Amino acid sequence: MTRTNSDFLSSTDPAIAELINDELQRQRDHLELIASENFTSAAVLAAQGSVLTNKYAEGLPGKRYYGGCEYIDKIEQLAINRAKQIFGAAHANVQPHSGAQANFAVFLSLLQPGDKIMGMDLSHGGHLTHGSPVNVSGKWFQVSHYGVSQQTEQLDYDQIRELALRERPKLLICGYSAYPRIIDFEKFRSIADEVGAYLLADIAHIAGLVASGLHPDPIPHCHVVTTTTHKTLRGPRGGLILTSDAELGKKLDKSVFPGTQGGPLEHVIAGKAVAFGEALKPEFKTYSAQVIENARALAEQLQNRGLKLVSNGTDNHLLLVDLRSVNLTGKQADQLVSTVNITANKNTIPFDPQSPFVTSGLRLGSPAMTTRGLGVAEFTEIANIISDRLLSPDSDVVTQDCRQRVAALCDRFPLYPHLEIPVPALA
């Protein structure tokens, strides 16, 4: 009888097997609304749990420092080719272990310590790697930050241009972790050209929407594009670097290896290749369109229930609830929805009076539950559940009712029904 990986795990380490099962059950029983999370396909999971994890493969396809890479080369080349096809890029490096690693490789290629970079303020929706003082990007480089308009809570390109003209950064960064609106990459390139800066687009959150043609494409306008491969792209956790400049591509490759990494994780790269193949199918565009439609349905019903949204809505997969009008902090709201098995995250909002550890916002996203098959009607119901819980924070009756409604949704849309690790009874 053929034994599966799960069989070996359960017999070798039942404690870990049981904890994995516990996490599987948690994912099944919760509404996952963290905007940066998603559920990969079973095929991606299989690729990541394969014998590819055994192979060291420093270098690039055809140029390895180790022997025995003939099949590894084919897998990585497939991932590269598919990434280039998805995004229309001339060059792709699929080796970065994460989006942060991808960004750091770009910095190593384009900058010297002490150079000036300019990105969005973290509290307005930016990312740690875009110059936050707690990140290496904020320690090695001079940093100036732009934000959103206090009136519209959206990007003001005239203000960004004025700041860029004053600060003269060597690298201008666009792309965000908590910005619910469309990004105009063409305007950013115009600003970058005017001040003689490189333009980096970090599309970690919107890569799947870009791949589906549902968000403007950064490739024609940006010197470099980085992304994670999970989130809306629905692949394994990892990073990706894209450019249409072949010479710059060579520098970027060297900045990944040997510049910032050693051996690539070829089992993860195989998972990336599988996910990229999935993203090339027509069904993925249908999925991405539903992600946006579901986020808008969630936003609309939250507003109908009296909750305020940053920028008054969303154009993509995420939205930010401004909780000040209901006298809650983001930390409190996060804890309240968690009591009814909804997973979200507290988040700063523009001009937030609270600390980053408390915040005034709650970030919500639609990708994961769209993967489970939920549509507009279900996201409207999710908005009602969230509203009921936040607007009646002290009601045990409401809490129990919300928990039952969450359970009903999870039961209707099962997650990974084929997965289970048999665990022997622990002594």
Swiss-Prot record:
GO terms for cellular component: cytosol. Gene3D superfamilies: Aspartate Aminotransferase, domain 1 (3.90.1150.10), Type I PLP-dependent aspartate aminotransferase-like (Major domain) (3.40.640.10). It comes from the Bacteria. Keywords: Amino-acid biosynthesis, Cytoplasm, One-carbon metabolism, Pyridoxal phosphate, Transferase. The record marks 230 as: Plays an important role in substrate specificity. It catalyses: (6R)-5,10-methylene-5,6,7,8-tetrahydrofolate + glycine + H2O = (6S)-5,6,7,8-tetrahydrofolate + L-serine. Catalyzes the reversible interconversion of serine and glycine with tetrahydrofolate (THF) serving as the one-carbon carrier. This reaction serves as the major source of one-carbon groups required for the biosynthesis of purines, thymidylate, methionine, and other important biomolecules. Also exhibits THF-independent aldolase activity toward beta-hydroxyamino acids, producing glycine and aldehydes, via a retro-aldol mechanism. This is Serine hydroxymethyltransferase.
